[in-house]
Amino acid sequence: MSTHVICDFDGTITEEDNIIALMRRFAPPEWVELKDSVLNQTLSIREGVGQMFSLLPSNQQERYREFLQSTITLRAGFVEFLQETQSHGFRFDVVSGGMDFFVHPILEGHVAPEHIFCNHVDFSGETARVTWPHACDVHCLNDCGCCKPTIARQIVSPTDTLIVIGDSVTDFEIAKRADVVYARGQLISLCEAEGIRHVPFETFYDISAYMKGVNV
C-alpha cells in the first residue's frame, strides 16, 4: 500500500483562482452570472467554464498567458511540501479544472508534465474553446469537465491511501472518496454540509505540520 496525493491547482497551489482572475481582467460582464451558477451548482462545471472561455477572443492568447504568469503566486510552503512528498515516496499528481496554457508553464520545474491533468484550450477559432481530455466516465454523471473521480479511478490503486487537497466545488466529488481531505475555501463548507471529515488549511506549511503530527 502506498500514499497518493491528488492536489488541485487554482486557489490551492496558487493563491488565486486563475480562471476567475483571467475573466475579471478580460471577459465581458456575462461571465459573472456563469461563475455564480457553477459555484451554486445550478450549472455544470463543464458547461459553465466552457461558456466563460467562449467569451474570450482567441487573438489575445499571449496576453492571457503573460497576465497570469505575471500575477500568479504559489501558496506558501508548496515547494517544500513537494519535497516532503518525494522524500516519503508519495505519488503526487496535480488534477486541475484549470487550463493547460497556464497550468503547465507555472508548474514547470516543480511537477513533471505526466503528473499534471487539466483541460485544454483551443485558440484556433474566433473565441477560445475548451476541450475536455479528462471528461466524466460512465460512473460519473456530474458533467465535471475535468473529472477528478474519473482520473482517480485511472491512476489511484484501490489499496492506496488517497490524500485530496483542494478549495472548491471542483474538488467535492473526489473529496468524497478520499482517506484524508485538506480543505480551504468553499470546499470546507461543502465538506461540513455532507459530514466529510477534513483538515482546514491556509498554507502548505499547515498540511506539512498536520502530517507530521499524525505520522503520515
UniProtKB/Swiss-Prot annotation:
GO terms for molecular function: 2-hydroxy-3-keto-5-methylthiopentenyl-1-phosphate phosphatase activity. It comes from the Bacteria. Its EC number is 3.1.3.87. Keywords: Amino-acid biosynthesis, Hydrolase, Methionine biosynthesis. GO terms for biological process: L-methionine salvage from methylthioadenosine. It catalyses: 2-hydroxy-5-methylsulfanyl-3-oxopent-1-enyl phosphate + H2O = 1,2-dihydroxy-5-(methylsulfanyl)pent-1-en-3-one + phosphate. Disulfide bonds: none annotated. Pathway: Amino-acid biosynthesis; L-methionine biosynthesis via salvage pathway; L-methionine from S-methyl-5-thio-alpha-D-ribose 1-phosphate: step 4/6. Pfam families: HAD. InterPro entries: HAD-like_hydrolase_phosphatase (IPR050849), HAD-like_sf (IPR036412), HAD-SF_hydro_IB_MtnX (IPR017718), HAD_hydro_PyrdxlP_Pase-like (IPR006384), HAD_sf (IPR023214). Belongs to the HAD-like hydrolase superfamily. MtnX family. NCBIfam families: DKMTPPase-SF, HAD-SF-IB, PRK09552.1. Dephosphorylates 2-hydroxy-3-keto-5-methylthiopentenyl-1-phosphate (HK-MTPenyl-1-P) yielding 1,2-dihydroxy-3-keto-5-methylthiopentene (DHK-MTPene). PANTHER family: PHOSPHORIC MONOESTER HYDROLASE, UPF0655 PROTEIN YCR015C. This is 2-hydroxy-3-keto-5-methylthiopentenyl-1-phosphate phosphatase. The gene is mtnX.
